[in-house]
């Protein structure tokens, strides 16, 4: 579970800093929803890691909820981009279907989130250890 704890910080950084670095702060004027979703996800993961580090009783549930939010938040972007590539059709001009690297990156992020969710749920009955 310690690996998941540290991955929580890494993925929070990916959601918070990665989204801004990839799109720029000006993307808020294009699609604020996707930016806010990623920022909320990063903040939720940071909060869950903080609660876990303090050893609060709610920590396992908070960690599971944060990873579930992250997994759900990554499913649609990954699946939509993959579908666009499979259909050979760009659905949104800011997401060209030929951008295979973006599909792979989204798939890796989704896989990490899902793996951390599964580990967290399997570990959910145990009290958090101070990391």
Task: Name what the model sees in each region.
Residues 1-131:
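Topology signature of small-to-medium multi-pass alpha-helical membrane proteins
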């Amino acid at each position: 579970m310690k690996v998941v704890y540290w991955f929580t910080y890494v993925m929070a950084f990916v959601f918070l800093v990665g989204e801004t670095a990839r799109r720029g702060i000006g993307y808020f004027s294009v699609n604020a929803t996707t930016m806010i979703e990623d920022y909320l996800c990063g903040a939720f993961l940071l909060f869950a890691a903080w609660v876990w580090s303090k050893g609060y009783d709610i920590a396992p549930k908070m960690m599971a909820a944060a990873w579930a939010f992250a997994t759900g938040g990554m499913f649609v972007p990954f699946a939509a981009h993959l579908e666009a590539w499979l259909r050979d059709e760009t659905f949104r001009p800011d997401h060209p279907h030929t951008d295979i690297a973006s599909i792979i990156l989204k798939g890796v992020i989704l896989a990490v989130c899902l793996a951390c969710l599964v580990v967290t749920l399997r570990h959910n009955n145990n009290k958090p250890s101070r990391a």
